[in-house]
Structures are given as C-alpha cells and as structure tokens.
Amino acid sequence: MSPLALVSVSDKKNIIQFCKELIENFNYKILSSGGTAKHLIEAKIPVIKVADFTNSQEILGGRVKTLHPKIHGGILAKRTDEEHQIDIKANDLELIDLVVVNLYPFKKTIDQGAKWEDAIENIDIGGPSMIRSAAKNHKYVSVLVDPSQYQNFLEESKKGELKESYKAKLALEAFQHTADYDTAISNWISKERGFQSSKHIKSYPLIKSLRYGENPHQKAFWYGLSNIGWNSAKQLQGKDLSYNNLLDLESALTTVLEFGYAEKDELTTDTFASIILKHNNPCGASVSNSASQAFLNALECDSVSAFGGIVAFNSNVDSETAIQLKDIFLECVVAPSFDEKALEILKVKKNLRILKLSKDQLPKNNQTSTKSIMGGLLVQDTDDNKEKSEGWISVTNKNPSNQMNLDLNFAWKICKHVKSNAIVIAKDQKTIGIGAGQMNRVGAAKIALKAAGKLCSGAVLASDGFFPFADTVELANEYGIKAIIQPGGSLRDQESIDMCNAKGIAMIFTQKRHFLH
C-alpha cells in the first residue's frame, strides 16, 4: 500500500517540488485541504482533498477542517497494537505516515499591528493538533514543520526505513515549533490586555553554538530572534563573535544609544558619540563634532584599558575615523554604517570584527532583562535609554553653568552603564576618569579622581547612587571638581549639601538611581 502524506502548510516554499519527489521516488499519496490543496492542484500534483477523505465538509468558515477522527485516528494509531487494529478496521481508518504542517503566520500578523479580531483568526487550531498527534506517535509517523527539513527527509528516506532516532528528533523539533507558537500567542494576549502573566515564557531559536562561554571550560550557546538585534547585524569582517564579544557589544551599544543613533549625515553637530568598553564597563566615552574626534577623546581617558576593547559609534564611520581605529588592537567595532573607504582601511586588521547594525534593526519595544538565580529567573524592565532632566533639582547655593550642565548630563548617561558602585568624572563632553564596580562609593571616587588627576580642575562628577556620607564630596573638592550629579535620597543628604555649599560646588539631585550589577 502507498504511504500517505498529510500536507497543510502556510509557508509554501519548496512544497511543490517536495510533493513531486514524494510521489515520484517514494510512491506517496498526498492528502491536503484549503489553500495548500489548491496550490498543489494548480501545479498538477494529484491530491486527495480532506473533505473527501473524511466525507465531511469544512465548517465555520474554515475553522474546522482537519479536526476529525479519520485524520487524527490515522495519525495516532499504533500499528502493532491489537486494540488499535480493531478500531482501525471498525472505523475504516487509513493510516497517515507523514504529516507536513506549518502554521498560520501569527507572529507576522501581530508584527504588522493587526487588530485583535484579525490576530485571533490567525491562531491555528488544526495545525498544532496534527503536529502534536504526529509527534506523539513518532514511532510510526514522521512530522515536518519547516521547509528546511524537506531535503534531509528525502535523503534519509532514500536509505530505507527511517530510524526511530531520526523520527524522535523530528518530534522534538515539532514540539518546539508548537511551543514557540503558543508562546507567541500567550505573550501577545498578555501584552495586549495588560495582564501580568503567571508564567514567564519566552521562546528563542538557537542561533549558533559558541566556541565557549566566559571561560574556555564553559559551554555556551547563542539564542535569539532572527529579525532584530545582534543576529540581524551584518558582520563585515573578522572572526566569529564570542560569548564575551556579544556581552561587551551589548553594553557598548546600549551606552552609545543614550546619544541617539543615526545613519550617515543624520546627526547634528556635537552629537557624535563614541564608547570604548572593556569587560562590560566603559573605559572611555565622548560626544564631539565628529566620530573621529569622539573616538580620540574617548581613547584619551584610558588608552591602556582600551587595548583589546570594543568600540561603538552612534554614527557613520568614515575614513578619518578608520585611520584612528587601525592604530590600536581592538576586538570589535559596531556602528550604524561604514564608508567603503573606511572598510578598505580596516581590512588590514583581518581579525577585527566589524559589525553594521542599522537603526531599523534595533528593538522597537520596551525590553526586559533576565538573570538566572538558583532555581529561577529574575526579570525586570531594562533601564531605559531615554534619560531626561525633568525632575532634576539643584540642591546647592551654586547652580551649574551651561557647560557644566552639558557635562553633568553626559556624565550621568555614562555613569548609568558603569558597574556599581560607579563614579564618572567628565569635562568638555568626555570622560577623564571612571571608577567601576567598587564595594564602597568613596573607593570608586578615589579610582576615578586619581585616574583624572590634574584634569579634574573644573570637571564634574556623576555617581550612580546617593552619597551615604559627605566624604565623597570632600574628596572631590580636593581634586577641583566644581559640580556633582547624583540621585540623592540618603538620610545624610544635608551633610553632602552643606559640604558642597562650603566648598562652592554645585550639586544636582536626579531623584533616580542607576545601580548596575
């Protein structure tokens, strides 16, 4: 008896050729319905219509096509079970050997901003039911859910009877397919109706296995969405991205996004930003009138730490900037665009990873961050990139000058992306000292102020958390700091305010903290 394939696909890529090969090489009969049947018939492929197979017409405007005992009985029947054999004969079931199904494009529908009713109609019911039935009975039935599986199935079939291990792998991929589909639906309903979900469910396909994790003895994998973020970035040259590269690129990019992100010639004067990052901490940052000057300014902050670092730009990288970049060892450079001449210059550094990530490849919606803990996950909103000065208050007798306000705003944005406890010293829209990841705030201040040294005179200081004591203000004064920005909120705020007033230092409270762990 000829094997029977049930074919019902939304994505019709390669389906005609696949069905032709099933018929010509393996003597399959094709069972199909709706748009798939029409598509195959138009291609002169013989098809048994589901309505004729079940002797039951589609109802409810096509909502019920394949939800029928003759379909699911044919898929779920155990070939060697005596009781099943009795039911097969009693119900005149024809066994189905292959299920080829992919689902209504729900993700595509909601990504296009579909209305609630339209999205609901694009929730597939019959498809997941057939996929799950076939996957459950994979000992006897093969299930294909993606056109990329067709060729491999044909090659395996040429070897003779399909191995159980191969069919089990297909079943795994099928259940992952339906799980991903249900995840998209549940997350969409939660978002649309503002419900707090009782379960945190996310589905990310495997992008690739990485060489190793943070250290060579750790395995690592990269999962993500195919149409957004780093997986959609175009790597123009260089070695494969590592686990650490991806972590650092993410930190560098989120920092530079504080200052806008634009294609060539779209930025206004003095908004070109460059961030140099090492081990998930900025080691230099600047905003200037060109990308090349911004990079040079950032490099001046800590040229030693920049060695082997990551550089991010919020603007096009031109040849002048490329000349500056090629003179030091870097792991990665990311920007929205690169001039052809710049790429020619950078090609001499064959191992340098160059990534082009355009503005339309950035996430459009608010994101969440996730951290693993023993037995669970911590999920929070990301610390958004829209830092505004509304709500900031001057708490001292002296107010910052216009230039100081620019520097305070700049330093505050950078400080947000430095590991806590964090202190950033800035002057003329560039960092001159950064103290990161210290267990006490004055310790971070000592590192940042010592790094900046004499350049501190007239500079500003930013702190990601409040001052528990006035010691940080006292230390800042010794180095010549003239303005401070911090969240405020300490029980001893007045001591810091009094110290600022006594030393002639301006201080701003943002009333917003930016811890980063």
From Swiss-Prot:
EC number: 2.1.2.3, 3.5.4.10
Keywords on record: Hydrolase, Multifunctional enzyme, Purine biosynthesis, Transferase
SMART domains hit by this protein: AICARFT_IMPCHas, MGS
Pathway(s) the chain acts in: Purine metabolism; IMP biosynthesis via de novo pathway; 5-formamido-1-(5-phospho-D-ribosyl)imidazole-4-carboxamide from 5-amino-1-(5-phospho-D-ribosyl)imidazole-4-carboxamide (10-formyl THF route): step 1/1; Purine metabolism; IMP biosynthesis via de novo pathway; IMP from 5-formamido-1-(5-phospho-D-ribosyl)imidazole-4-carboxamide: step 1/1
Pfam families: AICARFT_IMPCHas, MGS
Gene Ontology BP annotations: 'de novo' IMP biosynthetic process
InterPro entries: AICAR_Tfase_dup_dom_sf (IPR024051), Cytidine_deaminase-like (IPR016193), MGS-like_dom (IPR011607), MGS-like_dom_sf (IPR036914), PurH-like (IPR002695)
Database matches in SUPFAM superfamilies: Cytidine deaminase-like, Methylglyoxal synthase-like
Ranges of residues in domain MGS-like: 1-145
Record bears the keyword S-adenosyl-L-methionine: no
Top-level taxon: Bacteria
Signal peptide: none
Catalytic activity, reaction form: (6R)-10-formyltetrahydrofolate + 5-amino-1-(5-phospho-beta-D-ribosyl)imidazole-4-carboxamide = 5-formamido-1-(5-phospho-D-ribosyl)imidazole-4-carboxamide + (6S)-5,6,7,8-tetrahydrofolate; IMP + H2O = 5-formamido-1-(5-phospho-D-ribosyl)imidazole-4-carboxamide
Keyword match Signal: no
GO molecular function annotations of the record: IMP cyclohydrolase activity; phosphoribosylaminoimidazolecarboxamide formyltransferase activity
GO cellular component terms, semicolon-separated: cytosol
Domain remarks: The IMP cyclohydrolase activity resides in the N-terminal region.
Protein family per UniProt: Belongs to the PurH family.
Protein name: Bifunctional purine biosynthesis protein PurH
Annotated organism of origin: Prochlorococcus marinus (strain MIT 9215)
Taxonomic lineage from the root: Bacteria, Bacillati, Cyanobacteriota, Cyanophyceae, Synechococcales
Gene responsible for this protein: purH
